[in-house]
Regions:
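Hydrophobic h-region of N-terminal signal peptides that target proteins for export
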Residues: 11-18
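Short, conserved beta-strand element in jelly-roll/cupin
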Residues: 75-79, 88-107, 143-145
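A short, N-terminal "cap"/entry segment at the start of jelly-roll beta-barrel domains
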Residues: 18-70, 85, 155-193
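A short hydrophobic beta-strand segment most commonly corresponding to one strand
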Residues: 121, 136-152
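Sec-dependent signal peptide recognition
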Residues: 2-10
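Short acidic-glycine-tyrosine-enriched beta hairpin
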Residues: 109-125
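Asparagine-centered strand-capping/turn motif at beta-strand->loop junctions
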Residues: 130-134
Length: 193
């Protein structure tokens, strides 16, 4: 058998072999397409002593849902009168996109009214609060430049369908610790090693 023929046989035989896998620089991230109601559906725990109903939200993009190392995205509906309490993120920047409804927003030391289609950019260390001032639900999309805050969201919620128990003030404080965020009415806790 000629050397060329031997080489051709060797190439054909090895064609079905899988080469050694090299790690992707993007880790376990994978492309995903999610429809409106797809994602990790969770129900927020109501806060003890605060008249706030449980609300549902969808974690859509993050380390556990898509393997993302650089983005976190969730969606939520806020009923008329519902609010996102005043808080800030220590290391992450955030974007809120108001898809439907009307919101009054406190951003840093300024106030704004934001209608459907409006967008709010929140740099790290900036206080943010939002209230639904309209007659319809606010549908919003929240995006962070890096994961982490989803652990606070998971801490303060349960998977949809599980029993929902109120969360204490200390519980809220502990949850905000998980997300490297600070709630105005709750003193921050030292980070655990």
């Amino acid at each position: 058998m000629s050397n060329v023929l031997k080489l051709l046989v060797l190439v054909l035989l090895s064609a079905g072999c899988t080469p050694a896998q090299t790690p992707s620089p993007h880790g376990d991230a994978k492309p995903v397409v999610l429809q409106k109601n797809e994602g990790e559906l969770r129900t927020r725990k109501p806060r003890e002593g605060v008249a706030s109903p449980s609300t549902d939200f969808l974690l859509k993009i993050g380390p556990k849902t898509s393997g993302s190392k650089h983005l976190l995205l969730f969606t939520e509906e806020l009923a008329p009168g519902a609010a996102i309490p005043k808080h800030k993120h220590h290391g992450e920047e955030e974007i809120l996109l108001i898809q439907t409804g009307n919101a009054h927003v406190w951003l840093g030391d300024k106030e704004f009214d934001v209608q459907a289609g409006g967008l709010i950019f929140i740099p790290a260390e900036t206080w943010i609060s939002l209230k639904n001032t309209g007659q319809e639900n606010i549908s919003l999309v929240a995006v962070w430049n890096e994961p982490g805050f989803e652990e606070m969201l998971r801490c303060g919620s349960v998977p949809k369908g599980q029993a929902v128990e109120p969360i204490s003030r200390d519980g809220v404080r502990e949850c905000y610790h998980h997300g490297d965020a600070e709630l105005e009415v709750v003193q921050p806790v030292d980070k655990k090693p």
